[in-house]
Regions:
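ATP-dependent adenylation/nucleotidyltransferase module used to activate substrates
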Residues: 1-149
């Protein structure tokens, strides 16, 4: 964890990502990438010389079988405010639009919902648990399923 925190700190400093008094939202899906991002930023704020806060946000998209109670417990342990937002993404994509290749529409709806939530909460910075492999995967999925190149 120390190595990861060192890398996160260096990245934040090199790119001047956090200013004094910022609130950084973390988009939390419940997957390992977003949870590591949340934990890293929550721990970083304890020793980082520039004061900032962390706020976790989960979009509850209506996907069957999803439960975020463990995320809520983790946020309490980390002393991080947690907002869960109900958005009808699953219903729109599968019931209304009946998409056969839902990835692009789902991603757009989630991004739009997340941006709206950030605006409503007055938060101007967000951290997502995406990495280079995610970008490659998205590029290949778009190429194979939609016949276009894009991320």
């Amino acid at each position: 964890m120390q190595k990861l925190l060192g890398q996160v700190r260096r990245c934040v400093e090199d790119y001047r990502m956090i200013d004094a008094g910022d609130t950084v939202a973390v988009g939390v899906s419940g997957g390992k990438d977003s949870l590591v991002t949340l934990i890293a930023l929550a721990r970083l704020r304890a020793f980082y010389p520039i004061p900032f806060t962390v706020h976790a946000i989960t979009l509850e998209t209506g996907t069957p079988g999803m439960c975020f109670d463990a995320v809520a417990d983790l946020c309490r342990q980390l002393d991080v405010p947690y907002t869960r937002i109900q958005v009808p993404v699953y219903d729109i994509v599968f019931n209304e639009r009946k998409e056969k290749n839902p990835c692009s529409l789902c991603a757009k709806l989630r991004r739009g919902s997340l941006n709206t939530a950030l605006t409503d909460l007055g938060i101007r910075k967000i951290a997502l648990g995406h990495h280079y492999d995610d970008a490659i995967e998205t590029l290949l999925m778009n190429l194979l399923f939609e016949g276009r190149i894009g991320c």
